[in-house]
Amino acid sequence: MEVRKLTSTDGFIAFDLGDAPAVGVVRLAPKVLRDGAELLARSTTYAAASFGLQVGGGSAGLNAKPEGRDEAVAAFVAEVGELVESGRWLPGPGTGIEPDDLAGL
């Protein structure tokens, strides 16, 4: 398990299989727990494997209060763009995130 701390906002991304391509969700709340993100990344790996997909799980957590939500999401999108463009990670919306929030990716 690799956990990357974000530098532009209070958050992190948990990748279950190191450098393997990953899929998973982005969650936003006042306090997203790292342990929960790691478990979600691991379960996403197993779910993908059950469908014969050769990808790992990746789960992001953004810690932001409602008044700082938009700024946190914008910073996150700007910071992880390279991971998405390179094919390293395919994120989807989870709790607290709308599909339009990730449109810039």
Q: What role is predicted for each listed range?
A:
Residues 1-105:
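N-terminal ligand-binding/catalytic initiation module
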